[in-house]
């Protein structure tokens, strides 16, 4: 890596999910997230990277998933580049020390500015054209984990991230099934 990474910014629909939007009869939205992507996000956080979920859609499931993993979130953001400019500036992080994983046209402005633009395998051609990495996995199917591992490898931090991950308490509870 030319500059140490400080922030990992993730689009949601098409990156953390497969892009499908599920609405029940009451208009409530559900999303499906991949467990391996969650581990990748935790690995990024364990090496001190800020992780932000950035999406144009307003979505309670996105907020819940971000909170569960310890990531930050910004939902209902129409102009991602303007929001991210303020967010990075507020953190004192230059654009070249940020990575962004995207999949569609609304991600292009941000991808052209960050130091580490990444496209998912099933992203549109315009996004792939500006990416330093095109994942082999599609959005919602482990693409974020692949991107995080690639970034960790380039920073020489993968082994340390895995060590820290394995050293954590697992947080599981044990009980007996009801008889």
Where is each model-derived feature located?
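Alpha-helical substrate-recognition element adjacent to the catalytic core
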Residues: 1-82, 179
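Mg2+-dependent phosphoryl-transfer enzymes with acidic/Ser/Thr/Gly-rich catalytic loops
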Residues: 27-34, 69-74, 81-179
């Amino acid at each position: 890596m030319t500059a140490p990474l400080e922030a990992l910014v993730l689009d949601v629909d098409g990156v953390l999910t497969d892009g499908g939007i599920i609405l029940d009869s009451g208009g409530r939205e559900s999303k499906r997230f991949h467990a391996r992507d969650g581990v990748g996000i935790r690995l990024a956080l364990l090496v001190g990277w800020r992780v932000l979920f950035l999406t144009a859609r307003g979505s309670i499931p996105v907020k819940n998933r971000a909170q569960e993993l310890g990531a930050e979130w910004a939902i209902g953001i129409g102009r991602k580049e303007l929001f991210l400019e303020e967010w990075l500036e507020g953190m004192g992080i230059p654009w070249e020390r940020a990575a962004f994983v995207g999949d569609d046209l609304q991600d292009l402005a941000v991808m052209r500015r960050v130091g580490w633009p990444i496209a998912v395998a099933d992203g549109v051609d315009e996004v792939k054209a500006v990416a330093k990495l095109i994942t082999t996995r599609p959005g919602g199917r482990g693409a974020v984990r692949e991107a995080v591992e690639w970034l960790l490898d380039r920073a020489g931090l993968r082994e340390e991230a895995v060590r820290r991950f394995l050293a954590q308490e697992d947080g599981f509870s044990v009980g007996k099934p009801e008889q």
